[in-house]
UniProtKB/Swiss-Prot annotation:
Belongs to the phytoreovirus minor outer capsid protein P9 family. Keywords: Capsid protein, Host cytoplasm, Outer capsid protein, Virion. It is found in: Virion; Host cytoplasm. Minor outer capsid protein. GO terms for cellular component: host cell cytoplasm; viral outer capsid. The keyword Ribonucleoprotein does not apply. It comes from Wound tumor virus (strain NJ) (WTV). This is Minor outer capsid protein P9. Its main location: virion.
Amino acid sequence: MSGKIQDGVAIRRMSDAILFFTNYTSRNLIDQRDITLSTLHTIRRNLGTCWSIALLNCWNETSSHAGVMRFILDIAFSLRFGDFTMLGACGNVDPFDDAGQIFLKSCKATGRNDSCFLTPSDNFGYYLVSFLNKEQLKCVVDMNVGIHNIEDIYVTRMESIMEFIYYYYTESGRDVVNWLEKLESADAGLAAHAKSKRLMRAEIDLIRREILERTRLFINSNRNSFHDHHRELVRRYRTIWADVISDGDVAEETSTEATTSAQHSTALSAELDEVDEYDHPNDGLLTFRREEDAASNLDSLLGSLSGEDAFQG
């Protein structure tokens, strides 16, 4: 037994995180909010302070990589002031002595092997670890003091998250060949959950395109927001993306943007479906039901999280 709890229980808890992100698609946090939050809360509570390690390993694993990135994107483009707390640890429990070892055992238990992992550069790898560890600590809000200035914390943390997304965008465009070095070249004969270099590159390209489209949409939709913190966030996002998204790109957006964005989203979904046709079916994975998002104004601001999930007192 390598952990503080029995290995079987530890492996199951880590496997839940892998399966959650394997199934996660764009806007789950918005369109399927209730079931997503409920599942996520259970996973974070079970992982405790190993949450950042789980995120790191799921990011590196090919079948869950896109889910982690789209989860982070959903947080980065959320107008709810409490959603950033989902990157923070839920509680102070440290359930595993060696979370990395438990993750590897979970991968073996679900049919994943060495050909299922990305190999980012050392610089990006260090940045990723630092980012996740930092957010695990700083995204926790003290109920006694933090709730009174959560809007300011929201802007600061969202800026940090967007800086990571920007770095991901630039590095994945520059160094993607090395990221895919360990993956199989052929599409046929892959192990369950594995992705070939071609399929994984196509998926990363889709994520990069989604990053640009959603960033432009967020900036254009909220630059004249009635809420000054949202306007400040737009200003910071524009600064981060200044060398990629020009003022002209934003200024040229018109009232038809929503229709155009919907068309792009449909096209992205179609391309993802085409990519997924090559993947092996994932039996027993979590499925999400679509829920009507009928949150109140306060719920919209604070992120509809329970007390122990969003904040730490």
